[in-house]
Amino acid sequence: MEEKTKTVPFYKLFSFSDSTDVLLMIVGSIGAIGNGVGFPLMTLLFGDLIDSIGQNQSNKDIVEIVSKVCLKFVYLGLGTLGAAFLQVACWMITGERQAARIRSLYLKTILRQDIGFFDVETSTGEVVGRMSGDTVLILEAMGEKVGKFIQLIATFVGGFVLAFVKGWLLTLVMLVSIPLLAIAGAAMPIIVTRASSREQAAYAKASTVVEQTLGSIRTVASFTGEKQAMKSYREFINLAYRASVKQGFSMGLGLGVVFFVFFCSYALAIWFGGEMILKKGYTGGEVVNVMVTVVASSMSLGQTTPCLTAFAAGKAAAYKMFETIERKPSIDAFDLNGKVLEDIRGEIELRDVCFSYPARPMEEVFGGFSLLIPSGATAALVGESGSGKSSVISLIERFYDPSSGSVLIDGVNLKEFQLKWIRGKIGLVSQEPVLFSSSIMENIGYGKENATVEEIQAAAKLANAANFIDKLPRGLETLVGEHGTQLSGGQKQRIAIARAILKDPRILLLDEATSALDAESERVVQEALDRVMMSRTTVIVAHRLSTVRNADMIAVIHRGKIVEEGSHSELLKDHEGAYAQLIRLQKIKKEPKRLESSNELRDRSINRGSSRNIRTRVHDDDSVSVLGLLGRQENTEISREQSRNVSITRIAALNKPETTILILGTLLGAVNGTIFPIFGILFAKVIEAFFKPPHDMKRDSRFWSMIFVLLGVASLIVYPMHTYLFAVAGGRLIQRIRVMCFEKVVHMEVGWFDDPENSSGTIGSRLSADAALIKTLVGDSLSLSVKNAAAAVSGLIIAFTASWKLAVIILVMIPLIGINGYLQIKFIKGFTADAKAKYEEASQVANDAVGSIRTVASFCAEEKVMEMYKKRCEDTIKSGIKQGLISGVGFGISFFVLYSVYASCFYVGARLVKAGRTNFNDVFQVFLALTMTAIGISQASSFAPDSSKAKGAAASIFGIIDGKSMIDSRDESGLVLENVKGDIELCHISFTYQTRPDVQIFRDLCFAIRAGQTVALVGESGSGKSTVISLLQRFYDPDSGHITLDRVELKKLQLKWVRQQMGLVGQEPVLFNDTIRSNIAYGKGGDEASEAEIIAAAELANAHGFISSIQQGYDTVVGERGIQLSGGQKQRVAIARAIVKEPKILLLDEATSALDAESERVVQDALDRVMVNRTTVVVAHRLSTIKNADVIAVVKNGVIVEKGTHETLINIEGGVYASLVQLHISASS
C-alpha cells in the first residue's frame, strides 16, 4: 500500500485571502446559488407550457396563454444572466489573485531557506514544478470550481424541493434512481483518473530516458548505446499504451452505465407517472416537470465530481507548498535580527568545528577543525579533492552551521550577526560561475543594489571583462542565456568576478576562481584579483599552486584536519611534509609547470556549462557565437514554415494497420450518435401519451417505458465498445509515432544536437506533447465527427418529417443552443486550463534562482529575484482577471440565449397549432429532436481537441521523422576489419561547425598517428584539439579531406564497429542515473559485461577502492548526471567504462583534469597501464600527461604548427610549444 496522500483541510486553501477576496467570494457564492436555482425554475415553466398547450389544443386563445409562459422564460433568462456572470467572474478573479499570492509567498519562502534544505528536501525541478504545476491545481480548487460546486448543489437542493412540492409521491419513487445516478457519475472520473495517472507515470519515465539519452548524446553515440536507450524507451511506452487503452475502456463503460441508469430512471417515471395521472389526478405537465427535475438534479450531483477531484488535487498540492511556506529555516535570509557593526576588520576563526553535510549526516567532514585567519591576510587552503576545502568557504558564508564549535568573524560568533548584513561584507567567486538568464548588466548588478551603469562598467573593467563585452553586438545588454550558455567559461568567470568586485566586500572567498581561464586571461584576472585583494581578508581554495604561492598562510587539509600550516617557503622546508609532497606531485622533475591546470581547468569549466553546446565548447571567440545564432534563426524559420503543411492523410496512413478497428469503431460511433435524437422522439411520444384517454394512456405509458429500458441497454453496449476501439487505434498510433521519432532522433548525427532547437528539453517535449496532440487528430476527431454527423442527420430527418415549417424556424436558432451547450461543458472542464502556459516565463526566474541558490544567498539577491518574479507575473494576473470577466459574460449570455430560444420556439409552435398547420405532438417532436441533437453535438464537441494545435504538432513530428541523419549509426553497410592495428591518418582536413559556419576550425590539417603510439595534442583553448577527437569518432565529418583507420577511409567502415574500437574518456564524465555497476557495464553495450570484468575494469581505473567503501558498493545509484559522486570519482567510473570496452584506440580528452594531484597520480598510473599496446590520442594541458607522449602535436589557427617529442619541441627557439611552456612557468611563479 502506498502511504495516504497528505492534504490540507479545504478552508486552509483560502488562508491567504484579503478583504477584497472575501467580498468577491461572498458575491460569487450568491451568484452561484441564483444560477443553480435557475434550472429547476426552468423545468417548472416547461411543465406549465406542456399543460397550457396540451389542455388548450382546440382553444382559440392558445397563443395568448402560451405567450404568457414564454415571457416568463425571458425574465428567467435575464435573472440567470446576472447570476452566472457574478458567479464566474468573482470566483475566477479571486482564485487568480490568491494563487498569485501563494506562488510568490512560496518562492519567497524557498529563497529564505537554508542551503541544507536544497541538499536534502527539494530540487530545482521540484520547485519549478510546484510553482507552475501545483499552483495551477490550487487555483483550480479555489477558483471557478468552487462556484460551479455551489451552483450544482443549489440545482440539486432546489430541484428536489420543487419536485416534492409538485408531486411528492412520484418524487419518492424516483429517489430510487438517485444513488445509482450519482454513483455512476462519480465513479467514472475516479477510474479514468487512476488509469490516466498510470499512463502519465509511464510517460514520465519514458521522458527521463529521452532526457538522459539526448542530454548525453556524445556518450551514447561513443558507446553505441542507442539500442539500449530504444529498449528501455519501448518498455515504458508499452506500459503507457496499456494504461491508455484501460482508460478509454473505463471511460466508455462509465458513460454507458450513466446512460443506462438515466434511461431506466425515465422508464420507471413514465410507468409510475401514468399511474399517478390516473389515480392521483396529476396533470401531464406536472409529471414531466417532476421527471425532468429529479433526473436533472441527480445528474447535477454527479457533475460535482470534476469539482471534487479538483478540490482533492488542490488540497494535496497545497500540503507540500503550505508546509514549505510555514517552514522556519535554521538560517533565515530574511531575518533582520542580529548584530550590525560599523564595519568589520575581517579576522576569521573556525574553532573546534564539527560538521557534516545535511545530505550525508553520517559522513563527518570536520571533527574538531580549527583555523585562524588574521584580518587583511590571504589564506590558501590546499588538499586533495573531497578533503573539505570548499566546506570551509560554505561555513564562512554561513550556508551551513557547524553541528558543534563556532565560526567567528572579529571574535563575534557568525550566528550573532544579522545574516544579510554579514553576507553583504563577504564576496564569493566560485569554481562554477552561476549566471542568471538575463543581461550581462543585470548579472553584474546583482553585486550591489541600485548600482549605476558607471559602477558596473568599472567593475567589468577591473575584472578584465570590458574588452569582450564591448565586442558583443549589444554590449552590456547582451543576454547570457540559461546558465550563461551563450558565453565561454572564461567569460562567465570574469562576469562573476566583476559581480564580486562591485560588491566591494571586506572578506573575499575565491573557490578555484581562476580555474576556468587560460594562461593569458588568468594572468590579467589574477592581477585584477590581486588589486582587489589588497587590504581585504582573502580565502583561496585552489588546486593550482601558482595561485597559492604568494599567500600569507597556506593550510594543508587532509580528510577534514589541518595537517600543516605556514607560508610557501616555510612549508617547503619539510621535505616529507604534505605540502612538499603535493608540490612534488605537481612538478615534473624541476620544472614547476602548471601550464597544465590553468587551461585544463578552464576548458573543463567551459565545457561544464554545456557539454551539449558546441558553441561554448570550442571557442572563446566572443561575438561570433551570437551572430552565428542570429544568422541561423532566419533559416530555421523558413524550414519551419515549409514543414507546417502536413496532410491528414499522411497521419491516417500511420494508423493503417488499425483499419478494421477504425471501421468497427466508426459504425458504433454512428449508432452512438443517434441515441440522443431517438430519445427526443420518445420523449415527445410520452408527452403525447399523457394527454390521451385513460385506457390508451395506461397501455402507451407501459409500452414507452419498455422502449426506454431498451435504449438504456443499447447505450450500455455501444459506449464502451466505441471508446475501447478508438482508444486502441489512437494508443497504437501514439506508440508508433513516439518510437519512430525517438529512434530517428537517437540516430541523428551529433552535430544535429548543436542546434538549440534540438536540445534534449525541446525534443523531449515534442515527443510527449506533440504525439499526444496527434492522437486527437486521428482517433478522437474521427470518432467525434462520425458521432456528430449521425446525430445531425437523424435529428433533422425526425424534425422535418414531423413539421417542416416549425423545423425550419427552430433550425435558425439551433446554433445558439449548440453554443450554449458548448460553453456549459467548457465551464465544467474549466476555463483555467491554459493558465499553465502563462507562467512559463515567471517560472524561468524561479528556475534560475533556485538552481543557483548559493549565488543568490551569497549576494543577498533574494529581494531582487522576487522583484523580477513579480514583474514577470503582473501581465499574467491581469490577463487572468480579464479572462474571468470575459468568461463570466459569455457564460451569462449563453443562459439568456438558451431560455429566449425556448420561448421563441414555443411561441411560434403555438401560432402554427392555432392556424391548424401542425398539431401539439409534432411541436414537441420537432423541438425535442432538434434540441437533443444540439445538446448531443455540443456536449461531444466541447471535448473536441484543438485541431489547429494538432496540425502544428504533426508538422513538428514529421519534421523529425523526415529528417535525414548525415551520419547514421543504424547503417549496417560498410567494411569491418578483421584485425585492427590502430594506424590513423588525417589528410588535408578542413572543418567548420554547422552552427558557426564563419569560424574555420581546421584549414588543411594533416597528421598521422602510428599504431600503438601515444600522441598528445596541445594548443590554446579553442584551437580545435577536442574537435580532432570528435572527428575520429565520426560525430562530425570533415568539410573536405579524409580520415583513415588502417589505411581505410573512416566513411567506408561500418560506423557502429568503428565506434566500438574506440574508448573515450571525456573531460566531463557523463554518467546515467543508474547504479555504478550498470554505468561501467554500459561500455560493453549494457548487458554483456560480467561481474568479474566490471570489477577488473574498476580496479584498473583505481575506482574499486572507493566503490567498495560506499555502503551500497556497486549498487550505489549515482544520481542525475552522477551528482552523488565527486568529480574524481565520476572520472574514474568513466575510465572503468572505457576500459570494459577493451578498445584498440583510446581517446583521452582532458581525462584527468578534474582530479587533485593525489588521485591524478593514481588514475594516470591506471591510464598508463591501459595505454600499453593501444593507439592513444590525448588532449591535455598538464605537462605531466603530455611529457611522455611519443609525439606532441601543437595545433594553432587550424593547422599543426609543430610536432615532435617534448625534448625536441622545448628546444625550438621561439617555438609555439616552448612559449606555451614558458607562459605557464611564468604564470606559476
Curated annotation (Swiss-Prot):
Feature: compositional bias, Basic and acidic residues: 594-606
Entry-listed glycosylation sites: 56, 450, 645, 758, 1073, 1173
InterPro entries, A to Z: AAA+_ATPase, ABC1_TM_dom, ABC1_TM_sf, ABC_transporter-like_ATP-bd, ABC_transporter-like_CS, P-loop_NTPase, Type_1_exporter
Residues involved in ATP 1 binding: 383-390
Residues passing through the membrane, by range: 22-42, 73-93, 149-169, 172-192, 252-272, 281-301, 661-681, 706-726, 797-817, 888-908, 923-943
Binding residues for ATP 2: 1019-1026
Location of the region described as Disordered in the Swiss-Prot/TrEMBL record: 594-614
Gene3D superfamilies: ABC transporter type 1, transmembrane domain, P-loop containing nucleotide triphosphate hydrolases
Domain ABC transporter positions: 348-584, 984-1222
Protein's cellular compartments: Membrane
Domain (ABC transmembrane type-1): residue spans on this chain: 25-313, 662-949
The entry's keywords: ATP-binding, Glycoprotein, Membrane, Nucleotide-binding, Repeat, Transmembrane, Transmembrane helix, Transport
A Pfam family of this chain: ABC_membrane
Major localization class: membrane
Annotated Gene Ontology cellular component terms: membrane
Membrane topology of the entry: Multi-pass membrane protein
GO molecular function, a single term: ATP binding
Family named by the database record: Belongs to the ABC transporter superfamily. ABCB family. Multidrug resistance exporter (TC 3.A.1.201) subfamily.
Name of the protein described by the UniProt record: ABC transporter B family member 3
Species of provenance: Arabidopsis thaliana (Mouse-ear cress)
